[in-house]
Amino acid sequence: MTTILKHLPVGQRIGIAFSGGLDTSAALLWMRQKGAVPYAYTANLGQPDEEDYDAIPRRAMEYGAENARLIDCRKQLVAEGIAAIQCGAFHNTTGGLTYFNTTPLGRAVSGTMLVAAMKEDGVNIWGDGSTYKGNDIERFYRYGLLTNAELQIYKPWLDTDFIDELGGRHEMSEFMIACGFDYKMSVEKAYSTDSNMLGATHEAKDLEYLNSSVKIVNPIMGVKFWDESVKIPAEEVTVRFEQGHPVALNGKTFSDDVEMMLEANRIGGRHGLGMSDQIENRIIEAKSRGIYEAPGMALLHIAYERLLTGIHNEDTIEQYHAHGRQLGRLLYQGRWFDSQALMLRDSLQRWVASQITGEVTLELRRGNDYSILNTVSENLTYKPERLTMEKGDSVFSPDDRIGQLTMRNLDITDTREKLFGYAKTGLLSSSAASGVPQVENLENKGQ
């Protein structure tokens, strides 16, 4: 069976991931007019820039959908977002600022839940608005086929007939108007935005040029913290975790994770927390650039890692970071539910997150400027009395430390012998000044 259909399958049911925007509206109407039977599926991911979700399926029916469904994906999205925080599943960082993989998390959820809904309706052909140069075309492909092994893919934006007729936004707008729909193009921004309740991605157009900075972006989840005219008073906030799960903000306990994430977004958003500028490597190995917002994810991540460093030992923390980066890359590639990702997730959630219980108090200021004011946990292995310089009872004595240092003589001797061995082979040069072979100064050799 052919997995990817290059031309419209006339007379067959096609499920389209319908956003209600110009692209998917024109595609749905065009498919109906050309003889296909389109079904519209809209994912409610809690997008901060979407005002009326209920209106989207109604518009789809007006444009010719055989049926239109709104699928509430918010609970699952937040669950996956919390799992990513527990695992540190983030691999793109610049100067200490993190991209929280919010778009890949959204695709993992919508890509599986929409196809599952289509399968319920007997729809086994799926289309969406992803382009052939991006990451989403592969993410949706993987998640779709994982959910429905019989799935076939039809994308209007890969169909030359569709492209020839409606290849641009102007043509699509004219097509909608000619068909009796007063569809005006939205005002063109200097960049494109994709969002869900975990975060927002701003990219393309002017942002493709590295001399266009974050200052051209109008945040949809936060504030322009770089604008000195924007008043942002400092704010204290407490975040509580129980066994790796965020349960309370500022003393308010949440039984609904969706409401908790919305409140975390509001708190972090007031300061522009979690906004970053990243150059990343797409799945196809080409580099792209994005400006990201994730105020709630950033707030939870900071508190989680503060507790992590106070509870776990060095080797566990090292494995958390190493495996988290590996898992973040798998998530980015659309492999969040692959076996290698599940193995890493299970290990990190079972042996790391389960011990993260406690409360962190922060002072948020502008952007990513914050201070940690207090850390409290019954599981802390940070115990100041162990290392206090004040006189009193100690868990070990000076003689104990002398013995420990003496034991180091073994590996120090081995290391010294290795260094002189490297010098004999020419990898290092002998140094009379230090007595230790060193890397030769290339400047002295005129190189």
Swiss-Prot record:
Instruction: Describe which pathway this protein belongs to, using the record's wording.
Output: Amino-acid biosynthesis; L-arginine biosynthesis; L-arginine from L-ornithine and carbamoyl phosphate: step 2/3
Q: Where in the cell is it found?
A: Cytoplasm
Which molecular function terms from Gene Ontology are attached?
argininosuccinate synthase activity; ATP binding; protein homodimerization activity
Coiled-coil positions = none
Q: Which UniProt keywords apply?
A: Amino-acid biosynthesis, Arginine biosynthesis, ATP-binding, Cytoplasm, Ligase, Nucleotide-binding
Q: Please, which domain of life does this record's source organism belong to? A: Bacteria
Q: Which CDD domains match?
A: ASS
Matches recorded under InterPro entries? Arg_succ_synth_type2_subfam, Arginosuc_syn_C, Arginosuc_syn_N, Arginosuc_synth, Arginosuc_synth_CS, Arginosuc_synth_type_1_subfam, AS_cat/multimer_dom_body, AS_multimer_C_tail
What this protein catalyses is:
L-citrulline + L-aspartate + ATP = 2-(N(omega)-L-arginino)succinate + AMP + diphosphate + H(+)
Coarsely, its chief localization is cytoplasm
Q: What is its EC number?
A: 6.3.4.5
Quote the record's binding site residues for L-citrulline: Y99, N135, R139, S192, T201, E203, E280
Gene Ontology terms, cellular component aspect?
Answer: cytoplasm
Residue positions binding L-aspartate? T131, N135, D136
Q: Please indicate if the UniProt record lists Cytoplasm as a keyword.
A: yes
What Gene Ontology terms for biological process does this UniProt record contain? argininosuccinate metabolic process; L-arginine biosynthetic process; urea cycle
Q: Which SUPFAM superfamilies match?
A: Adenine nucleotide alpha hydrolases-like (SSF52402), Argininosuccinate synthetase, C-terminal domain (SSF69864)
- UniProt binding sites for ATP: A17, F18, S19, G20, G21, L22, D23, T24, S25, A43, G129, T131, D136, D194
Give the record's family classification: Belongs to the argininosuccinate synthase family. Type 2 subfamily.
- Can you state the subunit structure given in the record? Homotetramer.
Q: What is this protein called?
A: Argininosuccinate synthase
Supply the source organism for this entry.
Escherichia coli O127:H6 (strain E2348/69 / EPEC)
